[in-house]
Swiss-Prot record:
GO cellular component: mitochondrial inner membrane; respiratory chain complex III
Species this chain originates from: Geomys pinetis (Southeastern pocket gopher)
Cofactor binding, note field: Binds 2 heme b groups non-covalently.
Residues reported in the UniProt entry to bind a ubiquinone: 201
InterPro entries membership: Cyt_b/b6_C, Cyt_b/b6_C_sf, Cyt_b/b6_N, Cytb/b6-like_sf, Cytochrome_b, Cytochrome_b_C_euk/bac, Cytochrome_b_N_euk/bac, Di-haem_cyt_TM
Further details from the record: Heme 1 (or BL or b562) is low-potential and absorbs at about 562 nm, and heme 2 (or BH or b566) is high-potential and absorbs at about 566 nm.
Protein name: Cytochrome b
Residues annotated for heme b b562 binding in this entry: 83, 182
């Protein structure tokens, strides 16, 4: 009789994805973040579901319903802070996952990479709509500023903004539809994550050397299931430390004040994980140009497979490209810092230089470095 996991129609899918999956024998800890993103998604959907049971998406009661969750619901404060900090954790894992993909040349699996970019856009949309829901000062003004960017689109911009708002300003209709979007998007993300995995398992995982490893693959279980579990334990320890000791460390104090359309906060800024893109947006003096730069800061990732000039896949044995990669990482940290600063000298020029560096490294310097390395190796 055949083993059930190999014959049962449902178990067979799980078996091919998580048990008998042939995996390269040398993938490092940087490959753990895919499974950790899955954990983050499950965590966010489950905590979000319990929050949605008590939340009301009405401008008059949204803020007090969040207060009610924290004060009156059993462990409501824990669920709320797990959900809020879970978003930060999600983006930390997401950015490391993308960074690993760039470093080891995983973007050459074009379908998997493009679905990954789509997942990034959807996750950003989910985080943005979620940030509006507590209806604090930063929620309201963040929604006003970011949705207003669409008015830069020629001809249809203003109509588009009013269509999204459901009126002539950010109000009850906006909050209700943002809640609807925030609820449905994670399930779309979960479905797309399955497609992401499907395409990945068509080609098999990449590895640090960037060379085919078909001759020495090992089954996923027990080797990588155990390794992933270690990552899960470490991530949960970090997460619970953040939630239980520093729950408000990554939030904005302004969001503890109810939304007031008549009073603008001194510095309107998004959550920390969007600050790099916000800095790029602000570094362009023209509104439409800023919006294009903002979208391109993420969309530029889709060009990576076509900008790959090196004969080697991974950066492991390419010191010149490695230097540029870490310059890019440093540049992103710099942009994140600038995004949280007021628009005044010297921050303006630092942001503009960092933005130019960001696009230059990806679009010009890394392809050139690949060609130089080929030349040096006489390839």
């Amino acid at each position: 009789m055949a083993i059930m996991r190999k014959s049962h129609p449902l178990m067979k899918i799980v078996n091919h994805a998580f048990i008998d999956l042939p995996t390269p024998p040398n993938i490092s800890g940087w490959w753990n973040f895919g499974s950790l993103l899955g954990l983050c998604l499950i965590l966010q959907i489950s905590t979000g579901l319990f929050l949605a049971m008590h939340y009301t998406s009405d401008t008059l009661t949204a803020f007090s319903s969040v207060t009610h969750i924290c004060r009156d619901v059993n462990y409501g404060w824990l669920i709320r802070y797990m959900h809020a900090n879970g978003a930060s954790l999600f983006f930390i894992c997401l950015y490391i996952h993308i960074g690993r993909g760039i470093y080891y040349g995983s973007y050459l699996y074009t379908e998997t990479w493009n679905i990954g970019i789509l997942l990034l856009f959807l996750t950003m949309a989910t985080a943005f709509t979620g940030y509006i829901l507590p209806w604090g000062q930063m929620s309201f003004w963040g929604a006003t500023v970011i949705t207003n960017l669409l008015s830069a689109i020629p001809y249809i911009g203003q109509d588009l903004v009013e269509w999204i708002w459901g009126g002539f300003s950010v109000d009850k209709a906006t909050l209700t539809r943002f809640f609807a979007f925030h609820f449905i998007l994670p399930f779309i993300i979960a479905a797309l994550a399955m497609v992401h995995l499907l395409f990945l398992h068509e080609t098999g995982s990449n590895n640090p050397l960037g060379i085919p490893s078909d001759c020495g693959k090992v089954p996923f279980h027990p080797y990588y299931s155990t390794k992933d579990f270690l990552g899960v334990i470490m991530l949960l320890m970090l997460f619970l430390t953040l939630v239980l000791f520093f729950p408000d460390k990554l939030g904005d104090p302004d969001n503890y004040m109810p939304a007031n359309p008549l009073n603008t906060p001194p510095h309107i800024k998004p959550e920390w994980y969007f600050l790099f893109a916000y800095a790029i947006l602000r570094s362009v003096p023209n509104k439409l140009g800023g919006v294009v730069a903002l979208v391109m800061s993420i969309l530029v990732l889709a060009l990576l497979p076509y900008l790959h000039t090196s004969k080697q896949r991974s950066l492991m044995f390419r010191p010149l490209s490695q230097t540029l990669f870490w310059m890019l990482v440093s540049d992103l940290f710099l942009l994140t810092w600038i995004g949280g600063q007021p628009v005044e000298p010297p921050f303006i020029i630092i942001g503009q230089v960092a933005s130019i560096m960001y696009f230059s490294i990806i679009l010009l310097l890394m392809p050139m470095a690949g060609l130089i390395e080929n030349k040096l190796l006489k390839w």
